[in-house]
């Protein structure tokens, strides 16, 4: 049987791999001038990192998180099932998102901001969720994101959004085709009472709503705003709104965020029903949609002022966002653009006989040492076949070394497009190639 990749995963090959690399390069170019430095956390974390951070009642933890078993524990799973009792350090999961792991790393490595020095980091990593595979929704996907700890001021919320929109611009998006949604989810002071209002509203309309919304009424009532059932959405349009229940501090924080965005010329739409699927969010939340692209949200984030404490650290403000690579790429393509990075011009070095391979080998090493992408024949092809191979790999130049050229200390350089040929000194081959690329 032919080996196949797991369902809901993709191989990043060729143009897609170059696109992922380009997104990472753009991320560094946008985020580092703002003071953010790269971070990488393990793909495997203890389950409690996500249970405490994302929330036990969220769909991510309850339905989508991949559990990891190894060694003897895997044998027990086969015989006893997945509900086997394990020590906390043995209860492992693949990361479904980036924020909780970064915060865990900050707490564990004693990097929690002290005084006026914040912690700023960005990441570009694979995430894993056990969702039903479909367009823009994979079981292994990639995200670029930032985390900013120690910044309680609403200016930090606005700056994150400004960075996010600049990132989309650098990716090649026409920002007029994107829609930025913002809302406030309140905080630990005002949200519990609002949560109870929404819960009661759902219970009052339980006979008209889907099974999932009825279940959410007890576990996570705010998630009912995200229901895809059209009838449920019509009902939830009449539900109480967080904006009408914000405490004075949360309302002022939200108003200041909007003033900063207005001053920066950032266009946004207030969506009073916008909620994020993770429990750690507080106050400002935001999402970016690409209407017409057919992929839904292509990124989002918000404030999470209680997450560091949930992961065992001191109370610390935090804000961040993440952008999905696969969805962003699909949206770009839907708008007639792409993220494929241009490949460096290639040079092909051909030989006119097996006895010249050692000399060709030396030329290829010299060109590669100079940073020039170079291919050569190692399969004993004829000179005609080598020309065909040079065309196949997209070489801009082909260097042909024959016995006469070698005796004269020369090599023939041919432009594959114009077919112009010139003899150049072997001693100056790097400079000659660079001039023609």
PLM features per residue range, with description:
Residues 1-437:
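TRNA-recognition modules of translation machinery and tRNA-sensing kinases, especially anticodon-binding
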């Amino acid at each position: 049987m032919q080996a196949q990749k797991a369902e809901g995963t993709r191989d990043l090959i060729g143009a897609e791999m170059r696109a992922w690399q380009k997104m990472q390069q753009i991320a560094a170019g946008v985020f580092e001038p703002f003071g953010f430095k790269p971070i990488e956390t393990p793909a495997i974390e203890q389950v409690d990192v996500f249970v405490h951070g994302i929330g036990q009642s969220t769909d991510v933890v309850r339905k989508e998180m991949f559990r990891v078993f190894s060694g003897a524990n895997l044998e027990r799973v086969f015989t006893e099932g997945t509900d086997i009792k394990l020590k906390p350090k043995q209860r492992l999961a693949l990361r479904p998102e980036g924020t909780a792991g970064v915060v865990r790393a900050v707490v564990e490595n004693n990097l929690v901001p002290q005084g006026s020095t914040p912690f700023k980091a960005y990441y570009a990593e694979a995430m894993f969720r056990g969702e039903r595979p479909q367009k823009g929704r994979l079981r292994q996907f990639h995200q670029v994101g930032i985390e900013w700890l120690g910044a309680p001021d609403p200016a930090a919320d606005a700056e994150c959004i400004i960075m996010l929109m600049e990132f989309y611009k650098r990716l090649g998006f026409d920002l007029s085709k994107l829609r930025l949604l913002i809302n406030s989810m309140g905080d630990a002071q005002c949200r519990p009472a609002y949560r109870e209002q929404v819960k009661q509203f759902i219970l009052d309309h339980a006979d008209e709503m889907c099974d999932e919304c009825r279940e959410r009424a007890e576990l996570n009532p705010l998630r009912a705003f995200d229901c895809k059932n059209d009838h449920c959405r019509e009902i939830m349009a009449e539900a109480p709104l967080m904006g009408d229940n914000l405490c004075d501090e949360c309302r002022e924080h939200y108003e200041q965020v909007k003033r900063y965005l207005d001053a920066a010329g950032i266009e946004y739409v207030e969506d009073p029903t916008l909620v994020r699927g993770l429990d750690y969010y507080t106050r400002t939340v935001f999402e970016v949609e690409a209407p017409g692209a057919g992929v839904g949200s292509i990124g989002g984030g918000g404030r999470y002022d209680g997450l560091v404490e949930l992961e065992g650290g001191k109370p610390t403000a935090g804000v961040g966002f993440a952008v999905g690579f696969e969805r962003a790429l699909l949206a770009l393509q839907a708008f007639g653009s792409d993220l494929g990075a241009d490949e460096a011009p290639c040079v092909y070095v051909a030989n006119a006989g097996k006895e010249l391979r050692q000399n060709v080998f030396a030329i290829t090493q010299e060109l590669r040492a100079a940073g020039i992408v170079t291919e050569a024949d190692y399969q004993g092809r004829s000179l005609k076949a080598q020309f065909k191979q040079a065309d196949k790999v997209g070489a801009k130049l082909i260097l042909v070394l024959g016995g006469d050229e070698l005796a004269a200390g020369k090599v023939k350089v041919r432009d594959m497009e114009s077919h112009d040929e010139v003899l150049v000194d072997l001693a100056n081959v790097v400079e000659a190639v660079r001039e023609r690329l």
